[in-house]
A protein has these predicted regions:
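Extended, low-complexity cationic-aromatic segments
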Residues: 1-92, 193-202
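Generic structural signal for small/hydrophobic residues in well-ordered secondary structure
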Residues: 19, 56-58, 95, 111, ...
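Short, basic/hydrophobic alpha-helical segments
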Residues: 88-107
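Short, surface-exposed basic-aromatic patches at helix termini and helix-loop junctions that form
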Residues: 123-129
Length: 203
């Protein structure tokens, strides 16, 4: 991370921490309220293999508002041979969208997922002169602020009785959009990496 900070400063670039997460129709369980003496029951539809995958970036640059940029992908809706999760081309599209939105070079920090290290991904990275990549140490989620964003997302989806992949995708997007507008949350995610929350000079 320290090396990425130096490169970002030299290139007037954004530091973007990347990661992926997923949510199925079976929600995480959490404490809830019920009348005294009544056991609360959350009715869910956990059949099938529907899954909403999310790939996201928490983006940092001194003097600018912190950003959360994401893409979602829904799988398991009965289409034969449908890939699950994000592949190299999906990551490239996310990075291209972030570059257009941020209008500056990007220093990407992510983990050693096989799709991040593949020959195809390396070629896609090499084709983008505005992109520099740094890999996080193994088993170090505490260094990636977007892990906290995923934790918050999963807490907000706890006990959610989504019945279809489409309704689950809508719920995931709604919660991520709320998070995007609460920049103080994103700033809080960044502090654990040693980055000081930026005092925005411009939007």
């Amino acid at each position: 991370v320290a090396g990425g900070k130096r490169v970002a400063a030299r290139r007037a670039a954004w530091i973007c921490f990347a990661d992926e997460c997923g949510q199925t129709l079976k929600p995480h369980k959490a404490a809830t309220w019920a009348p005294r003496g009544v056991t609360p029951i959350a009715h869910v539809t956990a059949t099938g293999n529907a899954r909403v995958s999310v790939a996201g970036l928490v983006c940092y640059r001194p003097g600018h508002r912190s950003r959360l940029i994401y893409r979602t992908k829904t799988s398991g809706r009965g289409r034969k041979g449908e890939p699950k999760g994000f592949r190299e081309r999906d990551f490239a599209r996310l990075l291209d969208a972030a570059h257009r939105q941020l209008q500056a070079p990007i220093v990407l920090v992510w983990d050693g997922l096989s799709a991040h290290r593949s020959a195809r991904m390396r070629a896609l990275i090499a084709a983008r002169s505005w992109l520099r990549v740094y890999r996080l140490p193994a088993y170090a989620p505490e260094l990636n602020p977007i892990e906290q964003a995923w934790s918050g997302l999963k807490r907000s989806l706890a006990n959610l009785p989504a019945r279809t992949a489409s309704s689950l995708a809508i719920a995931v997007k709604n919660r991520l959009k709320r998070m995007q507008h609460r920049t103080h949350l994103i700033d809080g995610y960044l502090t654990g990496t040693g980055l000081s929350p930026p005092a925005p000079a411009r939007p």
